[in-house]
Regions:
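Bacterial N-terminal signal peptides that target proteins for export
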Residues: 1-9
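Short hydrophobic/aromatic segments of transmembrane alpha-helices and their interfaces
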Residues: 9-10, 86
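Alpha-helical transmembrane segments
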Residues: 11-15
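Acidic/polar, low-complexity intrinsically disordered N-terminal segments immediately downstream
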Residues: 22-105, 109-170, 303-304
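C-terminal motif of bacterial Sec signal peptides marking the signal peptidase cleavage site
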Residues: 17-20
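Ser/Thr/Gly/Pro-rich, low-complexity flexible regions
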Residues: 149-304
């Protein structure tokens, strides 16, 4: 993947054509004028609200006049259809890099209802520019992948109808001191529009409730945070705590109503027991009755 600003300074070819001078403002570029897409590949989330997506076009130099360009669709390399799956915002495929500036954006919008989950949609764009401004090393095209992203609504995700309904879950997990993977029922309740409290994740005998926080700010990277908190008592160590692991983020999926917690179990000032994965599927009350696979009576606390 091309990152223009980094490559401009890092690649041997760029170094040959670039003459840099040191000033109070830092390093400045004084080579030829090139204009291109800032990257070769973008992923565009398509949501059920009026969101636009920007594809930056960058120039290596500024100019004292406006620079106008057109952007065209490369049909033979595109699977998405303009007017059906996406459009240019304001129906305009023209951009202007204003005088004194280096960047302008191609603005796109997706049509959520016309895109299916299984669709593999790509838009290939070509920048129409003077030949002298095209940098052969990077070309004048880019690709935009369209990905449908369902909205995150807590009640729908948890499959509850009322705010105070019990949350029913199927949990697939293994626990410390036991290498086998098992499936259990688990339960909880909604605290607010982004927080779920798990009441029996570590077994009914555990009095500790586990708080997890959903973050949907980036629709392409739906994350869960589990703050540091006591999880259960262990006979030799006392309270064992759990927390999210930065290197292995916990996440959730709005298509299939499931979430995955990757947690470190540890005792403060003593050390870690390891990192464990817990997979949860949200089910409604009817599915819970049909499933009837018993409460999660086994957990860390079962080995105390």
């Amino acid at each position: 993947m091309k990152k223009f600003l980094n490559l401009l300074l890092a690649t041997p070819v760029a170094a040959v054509i670039m003459v840099a001078c040191q000033s109070d403002e830092g390093i400045t570029y004084s080579g030829p004028e090139y204009v291109m897409f800032s990257d070769t590949v973008y992923t565009m989330p398509v949501q059920d609200k009026e969101e636009t997506f920007s594809v930056p076009v960058a120039a290596t130099t500024t100019a004292d006049y406006d620079r106008n360009y057109a952007v065209e669709i490369v049909n033979e390399k595109s699977t998405a259809v303009r007017g059906l799956h996406f459009d240019f915002v304001d129906n305009s495929n023209n951009i202007t890099i204003k005088a004194g500036e280096r960047v302008a954006n191609v603005s796109l919008k997706g049509h959520y209802t016309n895109i299916a989950r299984e669709d593999s949609l790509v838009v290939s764009l070509r920048l129409v520019e003077p030949k002298a401004q095209e940098w052969n090393l990077y070309g004048n095209t880019t690709r935009v992948d369209l990905v449908k992203c369902p909205p995150f609504k807590m009640n729908e995700f948890l499959k509850i109808k009322k705010e105070d309904d019990k949350v029913n879950l199927i949990m697939l997990a293994s626990f410390p001191f036991d290498s086998s993977m098992g499936q259990y029922s688990a339960h909880g309740y909604k605290k607010d529009d982004h927080t779920l409290i798990l009441t029996d994740m570590f077994g009914e005998s555990s009095s500790e409730k586990i708080r997890i926080i959903f973050d949907e700010k980036d629709p392409l990277d739906l994350r869960i945070t589990v703050p540091e908190q006591a999880a259960f008592r262990e006979s030799n160590y006392g309270y064992v705590w759990v927390r999210s692991v930065e290197q292995y983020p916990s996440y959730f999926n709005t298509f299939d109503n499931f979430f995955v917690l990757i947690l470190e179990a540890y005792v403060p000032q003593i050390g870690s027991f390891g990192v464990y994965q817990y997979i949860f599927e949200c089910i409604d009350a009817d599915e819970e009755a049909d499933n009837n696979n018993g409460a999660a009576t086994r957990g860390f606390s079962s080995y105390t």
